[in-house]
């Protein structure tokens, strides 16, 4: 996939997104959204490239949506972080100089952080052997990165299979492990703005928080400092393990994390059936005043949406404003929008991240 890059059009496209969000939320008497912009370039902390062979050489390539046969060959990527742009030509030089690193290499993924960490994943159509491992270990030292080699049924790790990010929220620095292959917010600067907005919107509370779709604990860590205790759910095993590490690394000890889907937790809270993963957790001991949701693009299913209606405050981060509006429509008879925001996670595309605080009428 390629992303059009036109900094001169940035202000106009951000205003178009803001107008679109206003229009979607207008039926619900929403206040004017706070708008959080993005850096105009070098904002994307991860990038995935297929490699295209031409003139006996391999080039970084991306493809336009719907066309996987016409490569766009790249020397650099202006939307990607400066670290990725610095690594791209050096890595290419190294694989061109090394038959071991070059042979049947077909994809390269980069993951970086604002804190300066970097990881490269090199994917192959062949088994990786000791010769590859020796060359990769030398490469990782030269580039000062963690490096992962992947082939079918094989994953070799040099360094770590995660990067470490550090983000400041209300004067406190939180450290995050971001595992290879797991979801992370791609725009680190805007992610920091989202965390601070959510922290401020939740406010200081004397009750408990339910969090659905907690991922690696991106929002969990700062929000846990605002409440008595948190019950958080996540279905991805990789994300659950990362979240547990992040809670421990940051000394956050008032969070209970369960590996359940939002739909399963709804059944548990409605006492439809017991869940083995909830053994030892007394759901009745929680005094939930707020729920935080950050669902996938499909939004909340109707049952989960009904579950959130029980809460005085619903803090909702959305990557799809259309499904956000549909969920608000379901809740509007009992909750009103007190705050809303637009976060420009994805400049130069139609995608937008938004947030709303819904409060019971």
Curated annotation (Swiss-Prot):
It catalyses: uridine(54) in tRNA + S-adenosyl-L-methionine = 5-methyluridine(54) in tRNA + S-adenosyl-L-homocysteine + H(+); uridine(341) in tmRNA + S-adenosyl-L-methionine = 5-methyluridine(341) in tmRNA + S-adenosyl-L-homocysteine + H(+). PANTHER family: TRNA/TMRNA (URACIL-C(5))-METHYLTRANSFERASE (PTHR47790), TRNA_TMRNA (URACIL-C(5))-METHYLTRANSFERASE (PTHR47790:SF2). S-adenosyl-L-methionine binds at residues 185, 213, 218, 234, 294. GO terms for biological process: tRNA methylation. It holds the Pfam family tRNA_U5-meth_tr. The active site is at residues 319, 353. SUPFAM superfamilies: S-adenosyl-L-methionine-dependent methyltransferases. One of its GO terms (cellular component) is cytosol. HAMAP family: RNA_methyltr_TrmA. One of its GO terms (molecular function) is tRNA binding. Belongs to the class I-like SAM-binding methyltransferase superfamily. RNA M5U methyltransferase family. TrmA subfamily. Dual-specificity methyltransferase that catalyzes the formation of 5-methyluridine at position 54 (m5U54) in all tRNAs, and that of position 341 (m5U341) in tmRNA (transfer-mRNA). Keywords: Methyltransferase, S-adenosyl-L-methionine, Transferase, tRNA processing. This is tRNA/tmRNA (uracil-C(5))-methyltransferase. Its EC number is 2.1.1.-, 2.1.1.35. It comes from the Bacteria. The gene is trmA.
